């Protein structure tokens, strides 16, 4: 029988799955549940060493002899610090060593309780990875614990070998051994390239070919990659391809971009029918909350993430099984002719549903202003989308392939969008258009204080007197008082600041003015000065128009 502590069961199951089966056990009470579970499992070879200073070096010897990782487990407090010399040796000798420390619950650290000190991160730069496991009480705790353990154990041999530290808080009662077996756990595997000399990837290709419902999601990518026709033809028919404007030209063929609206329009039965079996992602952040929610609630059987750095990105909460550390385009071209030569129906099902969705034809609003700009953009320009409403509403409209799209989606904050766009435009010869909301603009208005902008800069400022996006958040009902603070209501205009900084200023109050101003704003020839078009709308009306459009999608 094993410990009833779920984080310990996850730990032991994943040590076994990742091939860490030689373990040095040090005495103690707080680590007794871990020791009992490890020692009681037939797949582990355990060694008892009393002195932690010696135990750490003993574990290094075990790892060196066979070339496979070894682990050392100690109790809480200064017992952990006694492993420090061995960890330093493992780090500089590049030995795969797992340090497992039992710990008191976080609430009891620095409270004069016995054998307590701040253990998470105690080895700092001398370990390749340090994780502090949660105690598991919810499904999210279990997912988080599993992910942290996979992250740590994968790092043992990632870009060279070295030690990792796993800290395990254990609450009392400590000695309840009621689990009859280890749980089935999700194991994440990393392929460092698809190289037969590095790892046999035949099994990976077999798994790829066994699925019929395959989805490819491309996140933000600040580049253009043109696939050769021979690759495009093979890849495009095999997957349902999804990307947003931020993905730019990085997809073989024509991707589905209105998937966020499609998911809203689908009935629950249709959503069930369209669940993918395999999702492969590459690129950066995905804007659509609806897609992320859909795949978290309806997880695929597998999620593979392809990236040059090999990071563990478990975006769909527990679906990640495989990390492929290589250039995503190299990966695509590698698998193109390893796929079974068939034409699955799944991609066409998505395409047929999405092409039937009505295009937005909206009355005067901040959404229609964005649409007017996108439809009139000159070829080969750059479009900078600020965060919050701007980047989301732009997704409602089709965008020419020749337009390069930029956005600060690393952290998705409203600060700095204007400064980033102006910096980009300063080093660019093409026309640069910026779409930005009022809060983001005024928060970053000192971007115009800099003198590094020219006539290739044109800013569409959407001013509806506050944070309109907060009006559309489901479940948020605001009183008059909270409304003022949450949405940051204001009556500010950019006119004086724009004119003082040398911009041509255009004020728009209705649809007729918008049509007229847009002609000047989007003309491909350079003007004598940069332009700010400030479009004033009513935030309550904007929210109502947006809701009406989504209601239309349902019918």
UniProtKB/Swiss-Prot annotation:
One of its GO terms (molecular function) is thiamine pyrophosphate binding. It catalyses: isochorismate + 2-oxoglutarate + H(+) = 5-enolpyruvoyl-6-hydroxy-2-succinyl-cyclohex-3-ene-1-carboxylate + CO2. InterPro entries: MenaQ_synth_MenD, THDP-binding, Thiamin_PyroP_enz_TPP-bd_dom. The keyword Magnesium applies. Pathway: Quinol/quinone metabolism; 1,4-dihydroxy-2-naphthoate biosynthesis; 1,4-dihydroxy-2-naphthoate from chorismate: step 2/7; Quinol/quinone metabolism; menaquinone biosynthesis. Its cofactor is Mg(2+); Mn(2+); thiamine diphosphate. Its EC number is 2.2.1.9. It comes from the Bacteria. It holds the Pfam family TPP_enzyme_N. Keywords: Magnesium, Manganese, Menaquinone biosynthesis, Metal-binding, Thiamine pyrophosphate, Transferase. Binds 1 thiamine pyrophosphate per subunit. One of its GO terms (biological process) is menaquinone biosynthetic process. Catalyzes the thiamine diphosphate-dependent decarboxylation of 2-oxoglutarate and the subsequent addition of the resulting succinic semialdehyde-thiamine pyrophosphate anion to isochorismate to yield 2-succinyl-5-enolpyruvyl-6-hydroxy-3-cyclohexene-1-carboxylate (SEPHCHC). Belongs to the TPP enzyme family. MenD subfamily. Homodimer. This is 2-succinyl-5-enolpyruvyl-6-hydroxy-3-cyclohexene-1-carboxylate synthase. The gene is menD.
